């Protein structure tokens, strides 16, 4: 069973981005991600977790992903360092700055988050 976490945008007042995001810290759960799924619900999300900040280890692919994804890179301090609307079947997306966490979810997330925002995982 994969653990879940609540993802909050720290603002005044705090905004919940995803009430239950899959916490993917094992190789197999990170590899699987949203591949081979045909649909993405608005409240679906996952967090790919690395051991430390980096650019290469937090790069993602969109092979066998059939829908657009909001991708939000967050560093170890909880700061959003990059965002992108990832398109199906693209080979690679990498953050502009080192990150430890990669949040993937419905494209609507991009309207709620910007670089420099603070994120908290509960």
Identify what each model region corresponds to.
Residues 1-122:
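Compact, glycine-rich, soluble single-domain proteins
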């Amino acid at each position: 069973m994969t653990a879940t976490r609540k993802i909050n945008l720290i603002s005044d007042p705090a905004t919940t981005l995803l009430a239950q995001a899959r916490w993917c810290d094992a190789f197999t759960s990170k590899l699987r991600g949203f591949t081979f799924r045909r649909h993405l619900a608005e409240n679906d999300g996952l967090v790919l977790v690395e051991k430390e900040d980096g650019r290469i280890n937090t790069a993602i692919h969109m092979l066998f992903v059939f829908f657009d994804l909001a991708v939000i890179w967050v560093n170890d301090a909880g700061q959003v360092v990059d965002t992108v609307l990832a398109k199906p079947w693209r080979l690679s997306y990498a953050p502009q700055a080192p990150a430890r966490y990669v949040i993937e979810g419905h494209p609507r997330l991009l309207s709620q988050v910007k670089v420099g925002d603070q994120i908290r995982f509960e």
